[in-house]
Amino acid sequence: MKIIVDMMGGDNAPLAVLEGAAQAVKEYGVNVVGVGDEALVRRTAQENSIPLDGIELVNCTEVIDMCDEPARAIRQKKDSSIVVGLNMLKDGKGDAFVSAGSTGALHVGASLIVRTLKGIKRPALATMVPAKKQAYLLLDCGANVECRPEMLAAFAVMGSCYVNRVEGRRSPSVALANNGAEESKGTPMLKEAHQLLKTTPGIRFVGNIEPRDVPGGKVDVVVCDGFTGNVILKLTEGVAKMLLGMLKQMFLANLGGKLAYLLLKGSVADLKHQMDSEEYGGAPFLGARQPVIKAHGSSKAKGIKNAIRQAKICVENDLCGTMQSALDELAAAQKTEE
């Protein structure tokens, strides 16, 4: 299996990307095709004693920066690591693509270069979010700011497939993010989406979920538009950071706090592990014809390694093929209703 990796994407590239790729080759038995400035990558590997066994390098001369306008960058920077990597994926020179680069450019590239599954106009950005009971899949978390009810139904279908195939959960539950649990709550679009989700085949829809209940992790998939999802995601990240900071202040405040830390050290470590986004890999663009994984921009080696693991699982379980079959069933059901 070949995983194409953008060596130039992210705040810590190429060192962290190279380290993560090398670890993935060793731990998961995949082959990596690294796309980027070959001379820089080789020099980085040599200076940091990182083996290139199992890593094939493909040279390119451009990088899409975070400040670049996504659509223009995809059109104009043809020799960038993202464009070259996505074209390689489209041409069958790899099985999946992983990048910690520009989210917008990846979204545009996944849509225009890799193309989308039948019935999907634009892929949804999905991510596993830590929660009290268990992590849940949130989609869309930023790619599609405005959505129609039919899009949310498609997101629900794809999200269910992902949680089942990648996370191994049978009959995953799906909820619609809303400002109230009652069917009558929400905007006209959300009310219509609720009714549509009730009759969507292939999913176990459990109704609306209020934002205060989302962190409980009682459902497997939370569906929403990209604006709402991005707010939920960033608020969750902020609260997690705040709580860990408050715990640290409490433990360092006095001798009693330091003694308490010694007693709770293992539990605190478990909590940090559970809330570490790098443990969950990256955010897949669900709806692309082949797996495209967006690693966090600040990813270190562990985050890149786990994003590659995530891509491997998607390929092994034929996630895209499974989603297409489910979307075909959805389209057939909607046609029958018409």
Predicted segments, located by residue:
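Glycine-rich phosphate/nucleotide-binding loop
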Residues: 111-124, 130-138, 218-222, 226-336
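Short glycine/serine/threonine-rich phosphate/pyrophosphate-binding segments
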Residues: 13-17, 79-92, 96-110, 117, ...
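N-terminal phosphate-binding or glycine-rich loops at protein starts, especially the Walker A/P-loop
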Residues: 1-42
